[in-house]
Amino acid sequence: MLEYINDPNDIKQIQPEDYKLLAKDIRRFLLRNVSRTGGHLASNLGIVELTMALHLVLDFPKDQLIFDVGHQSYVHKILTGRKNGFENLRQFHGMSGFPKRKESDCDAFHSGHSSMSLSAALGMVTARDINHTDETIVAVIGDGALSGGMAYEALNNMARLRKEKKNLIIILNDNKMSIAENVGGMSAYLNKVRTRKEYVEFKGNVEQSLLRIPGIGKELTTILKKSKDSIKQLFVPGMYFEDMGITYVGPIDGHNVPLMVDTLNRAKQLDEPIIIHVVTKKGKGYRPAEQNPAKFHGISPFSLKTGEVLKKSDNPSNTAVFSDTLIKEAKKDKKIVAVTAAMPDGTGLGKFKNHFPDRFFDVGIAEQHAVTFCAGMASRGLKPVFAVYSTFLQRGFDQILHDVAIGNYPVIFGLDRSGLVGADGETHQGIFDIPYLSIIPNMTVMAPINGRELSEMLKHTLHHAKGPTAIKYSRGEASSLYEDQFEELHYGKGQILKEGKEAVIIAVGNIFEEADKAEKILKEEGYEIGLVNPRYIKPFDQELIMKLSQTYDKIMIAEEGVLNGGFGMMVNEFLSEHDYKGEVRCLGIDDQFVEHGSVSELRRMLRIDGESIADSIRQWMKE
C-alpha cells in the first residue's frame, strides 16, 4: 500500500479496509531502513496508526501538527512525501531524524528537546486567532514528556482557552515510557486512568440514557455535566486535566485507526482545548523492540534477524568509564548519590542503580528540578552526581547559577555527549557547554583527553571538590591516547605532552585526538609542534599559559565547541591583557547550529579535523 503514498494527503485515498495493510507496510519500511541507518525505532513503530489517523483527519500543510521531542516523526515524514529520504536518514546532508521546517512545509515546528510542544501549540492558537485563520492545531506529547515542568506551565496557561472558546487538540501518546520506563506522580496517575475504563463507559451510557427522557432529558444532562466533577472523582481520582479546564477523552486504543479518526473529527468541532489520551505499545510489530523498547529507542544499525547492533567495539565508552568509576567510588563512600533525568541507560547510571538502588534517583524529564534536587542533597553533606547530556543541561542553567553556584554546593555534573554528537543534529550537539558554564562564578569545568584521565577527574572531584564541577566528555569510545604519560591531577593545572619549536596547539578534551593527528602530519613535513592538554577549562592554568607565551610565537587553541565565549576566547583575552606579542589563533565552531552527520564528517566540514588543523598551521607558517 505504501506505493500509493507519495504526497501529503495521499493517505485519504486509502480505503478503511486497507488501513491495517498500510500500517504493516509502514512498519516493514521503518525496519528495513532504520536497521541500515540507525535511528529512533521503537517510538515510531508504536505511533504508526496514530499518525495515520492524524493524516486522515488533518489537511497538510494547512493544519499544524507539532511533535514533542520529534524523534517519533518518521511516520509523519513517510506520509508527507519523504519516504525516499530514508535512504539517507540522519546522514550528512541527508534527511533529519527530527521535524525540520526548512525540510518540509508539513513540519509545523522544529523539535528535539522535550516538553515544548504544548507551549508552541498554544502560541500557534493565539496567532491563529489574531490572524483570523482557521487551521486545526494538534500537539502530540508522550507520557514521558508530560513529566517535564514546561508542559505543566503550558497546561496552566492553556486553561484560558475554554473561556475564550478556542480549540486546541492535544494527543497524549501514552506508551508508559520516555526513553526508559517513566517515573513519578504523573506516570502513576496515568496508570490509574488506563485501568479505570469504566468511567468512560459510565459517562457515555448515563448521558445517552438521560437524553432519551422526554421533555427533561436535555436539562438533566446539563445538570449532570455541571456536577461531573464529583462523579468523575468516584471513578478517576483527580481528573487532573479536567480540573485544569481542559476536556479529557480516553483512554482509547492508539492502534485502532477508525476509532481515532472518529475521535479526532469530533475533537475538531469543539470550541475548547481537549486532551485525547491514546494508549500505544512502544516497539509494536517487532518483537525485539517490544521486549526491549529502551534498547530500540535510539539504535545504531542492527541485524533485523537478531536485533543485535552490527558494529560493537570491545573498548569501553566514556559513558562506561564514568559509570564504572562512580560505582567503585560509591562502594567506598556512602555519601555518593547518582541522579538522572529519565536517561539511566544513556548516561550509564543503570548499572549504578543495580548496585545502589537507594542512592539512585531518576527524576523524570526534569533537568531543572534535578539540578536543585542535587543542590539540596549537597547542602546536607551528600555528594550528588548528575549525569546528563550536555545539550539537556542547558535546560537547567538558572538552577545551576542560582541554586548551586551561589551556595557553592559541590554538585558534580557528568556532561555526557559533550562536543559533536553526530546524527541527531542541531538540537543535540553539545557545543555550548564551555561558554554557558564558564561564565558562572564558583564553577569548575574539566575536560579529559582519555579514559584514564576521565576516571581520575571524577575520583579527584568526588574527594576534593569545594564547589560545583562539570566534567565534559564525548560520546563513543574512551581514548587511550597518552595514557602512559598520565600525571597526577592538581587543581587548575594543565599538562605539556609534547614540546615544539614553531608553534603549540592547546587542544581541549575530545578534540585532542585531532590535534595529535595534526602534529604527526606536520612532523613528517619537518615541523616541530608542541601539544598541550589544558585539563581545566575553568579555572585554566594561567602559569602554564604564561610559560607557553614565553616559548612560542604562535599559539593555536582548538576546541570542539563554539568559539564565541569558548576556551580560546578566554585564553586569548588573558594573553592580550598580558601583552603577548605573538599570534593566537582559535579553531572551533563559528556562530552557527551544526547539522546532522557523522562526527568525522562534521569535523571536516568545520575544519577541526586533523588534516584541517595541520593545513591551518601550514598556511600560518607561510604567512
Where are these regions (language model features)?
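Cofactor-binding active-site loop characterized by glycine-rich and histidine/acidic residues
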Residues: 40-164, 318, 336, 340-341, ...
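Glycine-/acidic-rich phosphate or pyrophosphate-binding loops and their flanking alpha/beta elements
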Residues: 262-265, 297-298, 307, 317-332, ...
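Peripheral docking tails and interdomain loops at the edges
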Residues: 301-305, 309-314, 422-424, 444, ...
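A glycine-rich helix N-cap at a beta->alpha junction
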Residues: 85-95, 160-175, 198-201, 405-417
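N-terminal amphipathic, basic-rich helices that act as targeting or association modules
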Residues: 1-78, 240-242, 246-257, 277-280
